[in-house]
């Protein structure tokens, strides 16, 4: 059982206290419904060897170090491979390098210089396996809660938390819609790689704003296209082989959406093209990846003939 009592204690006396006190029952209900692969993933978690990190780096990477013999490292590697595919990372865990599909550390190096997370209560929406949550703690956040309904990501987070049990990071297997309206308790809210999956992007922005305290900051990272304030791409069917992609705005259009949703001080801090070095298949994620989704003759286009993935980071403040 996942014990959320430390989370409730952490949030006592904050605007999130009432919500936190009800989370254990909400999580237990969700866990009772389960998932067909949960037992297999739990077996992988149970196989993780008992190790105590002697050195922890979350600021410049995710690295845990300790004395670890070859036999123990082999057991560790096998257990972690049992939680494949690994999408976000990389993680270096006692000498086992989890070479994830995404070089999420590259994205973090583009995002983090523009933020001040020291002492902040942070919510990461669509947090994946929690890689960024650990890096947010490394950047000085007071506490980080991630929500993502994917059970494998939940288990991957538990694997890392096994070795960092006292750090104030929690992964809840919930969707944003499972959170109560008007939480208004987080200093910083992240939504990275989520907006284009939403049929109603404005509603998503409004829901994110509801989670923020007054003066809180939204960090929005999403796929964008070139163009002016009127340019928005709606794929006819798939985009880069993904069916669930709805709206890809230009940067000026996204900035307008955020202002219409009530954010102020809206500004774009980064735009970058996703490369096949940043997103690729590895031993830890053996399925298709970006190179399979691009036009083999022209990497500026997807296989559908649409503009290749370009991602922007926009920040804004709740007045």
Swiss-Prot record:
<dbReference type="GO" id="GO:0016765">
    <property type="term" value="F:transferase activity, transferring alkyl or aryl (other than methyl) groups"/>
</dbReference>
<dbReference type="InterPro" id="IPR027555">
    <property type="entry name" value="Mo5U34_MeTrfas-like"/>
</dbReference>
<feature type="binding site">
    <location>
        <position position="107"/>
    </location>
    <ligand>
        <name>carboxy-S-adenosyl-L-methionine</name>
    </ligand>
</feature>
<feature type="binding site">
    <location>
        <position position="311"/>
    </location>
    <ligand>
        <name>carboxy-S-adenosyl-L-methionine</name>
    </ligand>
</feature>
<dbReference type="Pfam" id="PF08003">
    <property type="entry name" value="Methyltransf_9"/>
</dbReference>
<comment type="function">
    <text>Catalyzes carboxymethyl transfer from carboxy-S-adenosyl-L-methionine (Cx-SAM) to 5-hydroxyuridine (ho5U) to form 5-carboxymethoxyuridine (cmo5U) at position 34 in tRNAs.</text>
</comment>
<protein>
    <recommendedName>
        <fullName>tRNA U34 carboxymethyltransferase</fullName>
        <ecNumber>2.5.1.-</ecNumber>
    </recommendedName>
</protein>
<feature type="binding site">
    <location>
        <position position="126"/>
    </location>
    <ligand>
        <name>carboxy-S-adenosyl-L-methionine</name>
    </ligand>
</feature>
<feature type="binding site">
    <location>
        <position position="192"/>
    </location>
    <ligand>
        <name>carboxy-S-adenosyl-L-methionine</name>
    </ligand>
</feature>
<dbReference type="GO" id="GO:0002098">
    <property type="term" value="P:tRNA wobble uridine modification"/>
</dbReference>
<feature type="binding site">
    <location>
        <begin position="176"/>
        <end position="177"/>
    </location>
    <ligand>
        <name>carboxy-S-adenosyl-L-methionine</name>
    </ligand>
</feature>
<comment type="similarity">
    <text>Belongs to the class I-like SAM-binding methyltransferase superfamily. CmoB family.</text>
</comment>
<dbReference type="InterPro" id="IPR010017">
    <property type="entry name" value="CmoB"/>
</dbReference>
<feature type="binding site">
    <location>
        <position position="196"/>
    </location>
    <ligand>
        <name>carboxy-S-adenosyl-L-methionine</name>
    </ligand>
</feature>
<comment type="subunit">
    <text>Homotetramer.</text>
</comment>
<keyword id="KW-0819">tRNA processing</keyword>
<keyword id="KW-0808">Transferase</keyword>
<feature type="binding site">
    <location>
        <position position="88"/>
    </location>
    <ligand>
        <name>carboxy-S-adenosyl-L-methionine</name>
    </ligand>
</feature>
<dbReference type="InterPro" id="IPR029063">
    <property type="entry name" value="SAM-dependent_MTases_sf"/>
</dbReference>
<feature type="binding site">
    <location>
        <position position="102"/>
    </location>
    <ligand>
        <name>carboxy-S-adenosyl-L-methionine</name>
    </ligand>
</feature>
<dbReference type="GO" id="GO:0008168">
    <property type="term" value="F:methyltransferase activity"/>
</dbReference>
């Amino acid at each position: 059982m996942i014990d959320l009592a430390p989370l409730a204690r952490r949030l006592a006396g904050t605007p999130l206290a009432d919500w936190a006190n009800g989370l254990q029952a909400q999580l237990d209900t969700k866990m009772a419904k389960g998932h067909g692969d949960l037992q297999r993933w739990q077996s992988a978690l149970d196989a993780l060897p008992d190790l105590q990190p002697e050195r922890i780096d979350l600021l410049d990477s995710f690295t845990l170090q300790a004395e670890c013999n070859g036999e123990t490292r082999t057991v560790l590697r096998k257990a972690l491979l049992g939680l494949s595919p690994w999408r976000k990372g990389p993680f270096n865990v006692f000498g086992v390098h989890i070479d994830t599909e995404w070089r999420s550390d590259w994205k973090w190096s583009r995002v983090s210089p523009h933020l001040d997370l020291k002492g902040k209560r942070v919510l990461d929406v669509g947090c994946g396996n929690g890689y960024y949550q650990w890096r947010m703690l490394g950047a000085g956040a007071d506490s980080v809660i991630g929500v993502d309904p994917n059970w494998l990501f939940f288990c991957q987070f538990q694997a890392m938390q096994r070795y960092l049990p006292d750090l104030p990071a929690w992964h809840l297997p919930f969707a944003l819609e499972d959170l109560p309206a008007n939480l208004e308790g987080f200093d910083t809210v992240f939504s990275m790689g989520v907006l284009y999956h939403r049929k109603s992007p404005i509603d998503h922005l409004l829901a994110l704003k509801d989670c923020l305290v007054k003066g809180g900051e939204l960090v929005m990272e999403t796929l964008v296209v070139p163009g002016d304030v009127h340019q928005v791409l709606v794929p006819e069917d798939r985009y880069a082989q993904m069916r669930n992609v709805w709206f890809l705005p230009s940067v000026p259009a996204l900035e307008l959406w955020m202002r219409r949703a009530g954010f102020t001080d809206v500004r774009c801090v980064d735009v970058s093209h996703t490369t096949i070095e940043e997103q690729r298949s590895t031993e830890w994620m053996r399925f298709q990846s970006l190179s399979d989704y691009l036009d083999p003759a022209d990497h500026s286009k997807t296989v559908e003939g649409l503009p290749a993935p370009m991602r922007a980071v926009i920040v804004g403040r709740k007045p």
